[in-house]
């Protein structure tokens, strides 16, 4: 038996087949002490790293027709390497998605030497609350559904990566969100897709996003440091991203 705890006259023990109980100290003989160690090997997450500076722009696409503006949008930029069109919304808490992704859009961008990382969001269409994001991400099966559909859509239109823009993550949802990023990163690696994750500017009230862990499992961690003023700000300032 293995001694689990010692008391004044009794010892709590566990047998080899897992049965736990108590025996008197005097009933135990041939006591032997052993140091038990367990080798922990941290999982190695491979990553994709570009050999150039990423200059990424989000393209706010709200309908299929808006995809036709890709040529104009690229022409208005200089030094652009990556477009992140807002194509994907999480439709419901079961993990289904709605998509306006376009293979023609991707094909044109590639001809201009611009990569496409399609953006998936938990707001502005479909689910759009902390409660709904928690209901989605706190279930393994729902995360799996979401990831499966994201990968399938990415491969269908030929994008180079997936950009995650989840802005409705509560404190209690943080651990489930990070598990989602871990699981998605594995599937992205298996399919040669870049994984980038968008974040608020780091503050004490958004530590649940766990940027340190993101940095281990994702390819790129993005800080949305817009030089703009929010709606309702007491001060006047720029509002354009």
Language model region names:
Residues 2-5, 14-53:
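Boundary regions of SH3-family modules and the immediately adjacent low-complexity/disordered segments
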Residues 37-42, 64-72, 100-105, 145-150, ...:
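Alpha-helical scaffolding within the catalytic cores
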Residues 55-59, 81-86, 115-120, 160-165, ...:
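Structural recognition of the beta-strand scaffold that forms the well-ordered cores
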Residues 66-91, 149-162:
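Catalytic domains of carbohydrate-active enzymes, especially glycoside hydrolases
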Residues 84-85, 104-141, 150-157, 161, ...:
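Substrate-binding cleft and catalytic face of glycoside hydrolase catalytic domains
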Residues 86-91, 120-138, 166-171, 202, ...:
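Aromatic-lined carbohydrate-binding surfaces of glycoside hydrolases
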Residues 87, 145-176, 217-235:
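Active-site groove signature of glycoside hydrolases
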Residues 93-97, 174-241:
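Substrate-binding surface in catalytic domains of secreted glycosidases
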């Amino acid at each position: 038996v293995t001694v689990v705890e010692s008391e004044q006259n009794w010892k709590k023990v566990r047998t080899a087949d897992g049965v736990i109980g108590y025996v008197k100290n005097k009933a135990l003989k041939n006591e032997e002490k052993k140091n038990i160690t367990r080798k922990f090997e941290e999982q190695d997450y491979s990553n994709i790293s570009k050999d150039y500076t990423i200059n990424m722009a989000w393209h706010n696409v709200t309908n299929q027709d808006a995809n036709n503006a890709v040529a104009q949008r690229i022409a208005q930029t200089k030094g652009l390497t990556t477009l992140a069109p807002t194509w994907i919304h999480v439709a419901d808490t079961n993990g289904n998605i709605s998509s306006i992704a376009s293979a023609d859009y991707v094909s044109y961008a590639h001809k201009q030497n611009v990569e496409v990382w399609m953006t998936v969001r938990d707001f502005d269409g479909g689910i759009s609350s902390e409660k709904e994001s928690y209901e989605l991400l706190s279930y393994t099966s729902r995360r799996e559904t979401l990831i499966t559909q994201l990968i399938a859509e990415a491969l269908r239109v030929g994008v180079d990566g997936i950009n995650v823009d989840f802005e409705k993550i509560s404190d209690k949802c943080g651990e489930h969100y990070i598990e989602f990023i871990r699981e998605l990163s594995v599937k992205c690696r298996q399919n040669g897709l870049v994984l980038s994750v968008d974040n608020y500017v780091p503050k004490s009230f958004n530590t649940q996003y766990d940027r340190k862990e993101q940095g281990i499992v994702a390819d790129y961690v993005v800080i949305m440091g817009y030089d703009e003023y929010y709606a309702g700000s007491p001060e006047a300032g720029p509002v354009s991203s």
